[in-house]
From Swiss-Prot:
This is Large ribosomal subunit protein uL23. One of its GO terms (molecular function) is rRNA binding. The lineage of its organism: Bacteria, Bacillati, Bacillota, Bacilli, Lactobacillales. GO terms for cellular component: ribonucleoprotein complex; ribosome. One of the early assembly proteins it binds 23S rRNA. One of the proteins that surrounds the polypeptide exit tunnel on the outside of the ribosome. Forms the main docking site for trigger factor binding to the ribosome. The gene is rplW. Part of the 50S ribosomal subunit. Contacts protein L29, and trigger factor when it is bound to the ribosome.
C-alpha cells in the first residue's frame, strides 16, 4: 500500500489540537493499516521521526433524518507521537506565508 493510501486525513478537534502542543498528531487511517505501516507512512510523508503509534477503531453510528435511518461509516484513528528532536508537522497553513 502507498503511504498516501494509509494516511487518509488529519483529525481536527479541540482535543487533537491540544495534543499537538505535546507533539502528538491524530489521523484517520485505512481500516487495514497496522501500527508499523502508519509509522512508516508518517515518516515518509512528513519527513519526521515517530516515537509511538496508538490506534483505535471508532464504530459507525446510526443517524436519523426524520423517519429515515442511515449509518455513519466506521473508521480507524491513529495518534502518532513524535520524538523530541523531530520537527513539527504543519497541518495548518501559515497566515504569514500565503
Amino acid at each position: 500500500m502507498d503511504a498516501r493510501d494509509i494516511i487518509l486525513r488529519p483529525v481536527i478537534t479541540e482535543k487533537s489540537a491540544d495534543l499537538m502542543d505535546s507533539k502528538k498528531y491524530t489521523f484517520d487511517v485505512a481500516l487495514t493499516a497496522t501500527k508499523l505501516q502508519v509509522r512508516d507512512a508518517i515518516e515518509e510523508i512528513f519527513d519526521v521521526k515517530v516515537k509511538s503509534v496508538n490506534i483505535m477503531n471508532v464504530r459507525g453510528k446510526e443517524k436519523r433524518v426524520g423517519r429515515y435511518t442511515g449509518k455513519i461509516a466506521r473508521r480507524r484513528k491513529a495518534i502518532v507521537a513524535l520524538t523530541e528532536d523531530s520537527n513539527d508537522i504543519k497541518i495548518f497553513k501559515d497566515e504569514n506565508n500565503e
